[in-house]
């Protein structure tokens, strides 16, 4: 073995990874079936994340997805938590699907779309009549000139490329943007995927139930990405007021929260009234109005100070939502009554220890209970807020913008026309990548215009030029 043979083998050894990428891995990544399969999987798991509630507590899944009976025979709370269906969009396998799909699109762009664009920007002049026979659409005219053809093509927004050396040859094209469109579509989809991945890695979701008049900071984070930043503690949010608008039949029409953002000194730096589909946004964090509840009730016994008692949501076994609390009517707490409320319309039901309805009182009214005057001053509502931060949203929106732009660009047909003047004969031919019928009609109209022009005038025009 010579030194040259040894060096050659060493070079081949180092070339193996590159050859594997080009010959084995790249054809798989650019395979259309793989891209379609990945897209279907992403769509299926995305819909799963929409159907199955995301970011809830383990107790929620245990209550709604029990082991016996299992939903569809297999879907239980254990399966949901093991597979990660309670946080689909942050699981390693879902992010891996996004990365693989993005890699496939990128590889396809570099191996197919970019070479196709470069090929579309290169052309050869047709110098022989036989070359026009290869085109799908061609014609031979005995009265026509390149000068007239060039003018007609320019009126139809074709870009003319005459041969500088030979004046009897012409090439024209339009719609090259249609070749760029698919590349822009791929860039847009990749941007959407990158935005989704970045949002999953750096975003978070929190939930807060805040009573009217309370101030809070974002602390109850239920789901967060591994790279999510800590929420700054130099600002807080105050719920100035929470209220519900009811329909004449007693149903809920809309619920509102009047909210203020406070700085460290307690000064208001932002203010907004939020309701469903109209959130508050501050420093990249969005506060959505999603739920409501009853936080407490303010009562007074005879002429005593005013007490604010908390109310808890009772278990009604799916028969609606009712909040309740217990109010002592004697100093030694030996006797008392239960107060129940189901909405914020101010109606409070009073029950004795035996479960008998004693009275029904509206806010601002009073009643006698166990020899004590009990006055219901107010029922205090609480707003349910879903708080999200997703730094990937601007990237996703930009990706959708590029996607729509690319789709529009792709509708432009890339049309090409060649022409050759041989004595009195004019050879014209063309092709397009889409809208073949419209292109044929356009070329036929151009040929009709050329044929209708007198031959003598064409010669005179050519001499003048």
From Swiss-Prot:
Biological source species: Nostoc punctiforme (strain ATCC 29133 / PCC 73102)
Taxonomic placement: Bacteria, Bacillati, Cyanobacteriota, Cyanophyceae, Nostocales
GO biological process: cytochrome complex assembly
Family: Belongs to the Ccs1/CcsB family.
Keyword Nucleotide-binding: no
InterPro entries: Cyt_c_bgen_Ccs1/CcsB/ResB, ResB-like_domain
Membrane topology of this protein: Multi-pass membrane protein
Protein name per Swiss-Prot or TrEMBL: Cytochrome c biogenesis protein CcsB
Gene Ontology CC terms: plasma membrane-derived thylakoid membrane
Role: Required during biogenesis of c-type cytochromes (cytochrome c6 and cytochrome f) at the step of heme attachment.
Subunit: May interact with CcsA.
Pfam families attached to this UniProt entry: ResB
Keywords, alphabetical: Cytochrome c-type biogenesis, Membrane, Thylakoid, Transmembrane, Transmembrane helix
Entry's localization field: Cellular thylakoid membrane
Organism domain of life: Bacteria
Keyword Transmembrane helix: yes
Transmembrane domains' residue ranges: 32-52, 91-111, 180-200
Main subcellular localisation: membrane
